[in-house]
UniProtKB/Swiss-Prot annotation:
The gene is TTC4. Interacts (via TPR repeats) with HSP90AB1. Interacts with HSPA8 and CDC6. Interacts with TBK1. Interacts with MSL1. PANTHER family: TETRATRICOPEPTIDE REPEAT PROTEIN 4 (PTHR46035:SF4). Changing E77A: No effect on interaction with HSPA8 and HSP90AB1. Loss of interaction with CDC6. It comes from Homo sapiens. One of its GO terms (molecular function) is Hsp70 protein binding. The record marks K152, R156 as: Essential for interaction with HSPA8. It comes from the Eukaryota. The keyword Acetylation applies. GO terms for cellular component: cytoplasm; nucleoplasm; nucleus. May act as a co-chaperone for HSP90AB1. Promotes Sendai virus (SeV)-induced host cell innate immune responses. It holds the Pfam family Wheel. Belongs to the TTC4 family. This is Tetratricopeptide repeat protein 4.
Amino acid sequence: MEQPGQDPTSDDVMDSFLEKFQSQPYRGGFHEDQWEKEFEKVPLFMSRAPSEIDPRENPDLACLQSIIFDEERSPEEQAKTYKDEGNDYFKEKDYKKAVISYTEGLKKKCADPDLNAVLYTNRAAAQYYLGNFRSALNDVTAARKLKPCHLKAIIRGALCHLELKHFAEAVNWCDEGLQIDAKEKKLLEMRAKADKLKRIEQRDVRKANLKEKKERNQNEALLQAIKARNIRLSEAACEDEDSASEGLGELFLDGLSTENPHGARLSLDGQGRLSWPVLFLYPEYAQSDFISAFHEDSRFIDHLMVMFGETPSWDLEQKYCPDNLEVYFEDEDRAELYRVPAKSTLLQVLQHQRYFVKALTPAFLVCVGSSPFCKNFLRGRKVYQIR
């Protein structure tokens, strides 16, 4: 205690205080073996703030936070604090936390439209870098309602429209921004890019429409050719001609049905004659052959001669010769078989009243007539000879 009348600034008093201070052990200092960890807990020297602040672990930081986010402060002050916090997270490229901070600022519902517009625009920027382009677009739209001439919001909105492939909208946003600043470089570059992409998109739409119209006309011509020949299609077996045409159209627009993996399709030549993709099945060996364009006026024997001009690798007994082969088609509804004369044309068979073309790909069974397999295969089935 100071002596009465003694000057507290005198050298004697100061020396006495220092001697007393030095005689007492220092408490609260850093431990030598973990000073870096303890140093990191001091708010001023933290390299990065913790995601969750525990008052027991970081009492100083918790105290600062309570001061910064004091609920007794005005909504404007709190919103600005959250905006600044979000900006710090944004600079660190921690966009998720930036979104959270800007959202908290907006929740304060402050009366300053400019501040709210900035919060929306900044949150849009964070959402943009997170790849949430639609959310970002919603935010810049909200910002423009508060501040229609907010150039940053317009630029960000144009970027979002580009990412969402809304090229016409991107051009419109750029035009609106250029009315505010006709020399804004970002808007000029973006508008040129968006306009180019818009024209490409419009060209592609026109090409797609022309292609669709051409295919629709081709399908209609094919349907009329099929109807004129009295050929029955299992997919379009309906009374309504428009529905039948639509059924054909769907098949062509889908490429081909799953039963035809080769990409071939029914076609009509310049003379008005049809060529069909045709499948030959050899049940004895679980093998098959696919003919991509079997002209309707061609005979079965003509194709068999080509396919079996050389013995196939799977015909170990070398019995699959054109003269030995029998061709059948199956009536699935009646579980009946019809033997096809080898010299008949494809059109003659397809016009048979019990033949229904499935998946636009006629299919036929082929086996060696004199073989035990064929006899066993036909046993118990009704077999009819086409004349």
